[in-house]
Amino acid sequence: TFLTPEENGHVTSLWGKVNVEKVGGEALGRLLVVYPWTQRFFESFGDLSSPDAIMGNPKVKAHGKKVLSAFSEGLHHLDNLKGTFAQLSELHCVALHVDPENFKLLGNVLVIVLAHHFGNDFSPQTQAAFQKVVTGVANALAHKYH
């Protein structure tokens, strides 16, 4: 795995406290607010007309939970992220034509949301470990694009 045992400890310890539904919904919502061009992939989700509409949109929250559940699964397979995310990579590349840069943006937003939710418990060491993980996941999701 690309994490040191200490980094893995930081990730595992914090992730055990994460509310996947709440954090996932907030992370995807913030992505859509901060990077509005990403909304084009979610036109079927209904009202995305304002930050409040986006953050309160049940479809955004539900998809955010789905995204973070997949991310959570990836945490159990850090030694094989490309294999773990191969199908999702293909779906997003071939069928949905998502710009792979968006995976990096979502990873960065996730780190911000975790910092927001966990405050002082989200130490610089924990942030560094999570940044490695979200970068690894983004690269795995972008794999089918190459």
Curated annotation (Swiss-Prot):
Phosphothreonine, modified sites: T12
InterPro entries: Globin, Globin-like_sf, Globin/Proto, Hemoglobin_b, Hemoglobin_oxygen_transport
Binding site for heme b: H63, H92
CDD domains named in the record: Hb-beta-like
Residues where Phosphoserine is found: S44
Keywords for the protein's UniProt record, in alphabetical order: Acetylation, Heme, Iron, Metal-binding, Oxygen transport, Phosphoprotein, S-nitrosylation, Transport
Keyword Membrane tagged: no
Gene Ontology process terms (BP): hydrogen peroxide catabolic process
GO cellular component terms, A-Z: blood microparticle; haptoglobin-hemoglobin complex; hemoglobin complex
GO-annotated molecular function: haptoglobin binding; heme binding; hemoglobin alpha binding; metal ion binding; organic acid binding; oxygen binding; oxygen carrier activity; peroxidase activity
Domain of life per record: Eukaryota
Domain Globin: 2-146
Oligomer status and interactors: Heterotetramer of two alpha chains and two beta chains.
Biological function: Involved in oxygen transport from the lung to the various peripheral tissues.
Family: Belongs to the globin family.
Protein name as it appears in the record: Hemoglobin subunit beta
Organism: Lemur catta (Ring-tailed lemur)
Gene behind this protein: HBB
